[in-house]
Amino acid sequence: LHMIHLHWYQYPPMNPMMYPLLLIFMFITGIPCLAGNFVTIWVFMTTKSLRSPANLLVVNLAMSDFLMMFTMFPPMMITCYYHTWTLGPTFCQVYAFLGNLFGCTSIWTMVFITFDRYNVIVKGVAGEPLSNKKAALWILSAWVLSFSWCSAPFFGWNRYVPEGNLTGCGTDYLSEDALSRSYLYVYSVWVYFLPLLITIYCYVFIIKAVAAHEKGMRDQAKKMGIKSLRNEEAQKTSAECRLAKIAMTTVALWFIAWTPYLLINWVGMFARSYLSPVYTIWGYVFAKANAVYNPIVYAIS
């Protein structure tokens, strides 16, 4: 109880029907997410032709999504069943830490996937090919940096507390302490705004390169008096373009999933009177649904 902010005490308990709905949602998303990401990992790791440096990033993305749902799914089922957080203050902090860690790792892995597509499509032969060593370094960087940032609340820079709905835990966005708020400012930049800017930058040039390539193919085909010009190299480039579209879709879905949680944090800091326990549900509902999207997108590819 000492971890629950006084702001939440002014609200009556949530409608009891919300908890069965959350249970159903978690079951519908949890099982497909675990199965989908496990299959993605298994297929990429056991199929020799898919063991490329770029696909190491895909495997890491599936791994972080799998671990997110694996660690979030059971506690959410338990707390929804009991209508409150029953797993103690220590596990509340661990739960919030793991959710942030795997979420942060996922977004930076997708940023690296986007940057790899940028390198292949925009720079082409002039770009340095992604090697296994470089892919492993990117993956290690995503985990180490994410772990560092997400560990900060354990050392007094912000803290992990129960959400207003008492079925999950997250960062303390209701504290008025300047040090605590500074963590949310920096974390928002690191996990949301910086990846967003990098992604937009890469895709602006990717789209330009794809458009220029397709126009060149059409013009060349017209000069030769044929409907299309698709040699082996063109087919390879077309495949790279399809992969770029898949990566762009995945990143877009990630930002759609995490934007509500970001907004909840900022509303909690600057306009808490508009924030009720029911609204806090949508933040992690969208965030956890993100872990389901990625295996679906990559399965289609």
Curated annotation (Swiss-Prot):
Disulfide bonds join C92-C169. Homodimer. Interacts with GNAQ. Photoreceptor required for image-forming vision at low light intensity. Can use both retinal and 3-dehydroretinal as visual pigment. Light-induced isomerization of 11-cis to all-trans retinal triggers a conformational change that activates signaling via G-proteins. Signaling via GNAQ probably mediates the activation of phospholipase C. Keywords: Cell membrane, Cell projection, Chromophore, Disulfide bond, G-protein coupled receptor, Glycoprotein, Membrane, Phosphoprotein, Photoreceptor protein, Receptor, Retinal protein, Sensory transduction, Transducer, Transmembrane, Transmembrane helix, Vision. One of its GO terms (molecular function) is photoreceptor activity. The modification N6-(retinylidene)lysine is found at K288. The lineage of its organism: Eukaryota, Metazoa, Ecdysozoa, Arthropoda, Crustacea. GO terms for biological process: phototransduction; visual perception. SUPFAM superfamilies: Family A G protein-coupled receptor-like. PANTHER family: OPSIN (PTHR24240). The gene is RHO. Glycans are attached at N165. A motif ('Ionic lock' involved in activated form stabilization) lies at residues 116-118. It is found in: Cell projection, Rhabdomere membrane. Belongs to the G-protein coupled receptor 1 family. Opsin subfamily. It comes from the Eukaryota. It comes from Cambarellus shufeldtii. It is a multi-pass membrane protein. Residues 44-55, 116-134, 205-245 are cytoplasmic. Residues 1-18, 79-92, 156-182, 268-278 are extracellular. Contains one covalently linked retinal chromophore. The chain crosses the membrane at residues 19-43, 56-78, 93-115, 135-155, 183-204, 246-267, 279-300. This is Rhodopsin. GO terms for cellular component: cell projection; plasma membrane.
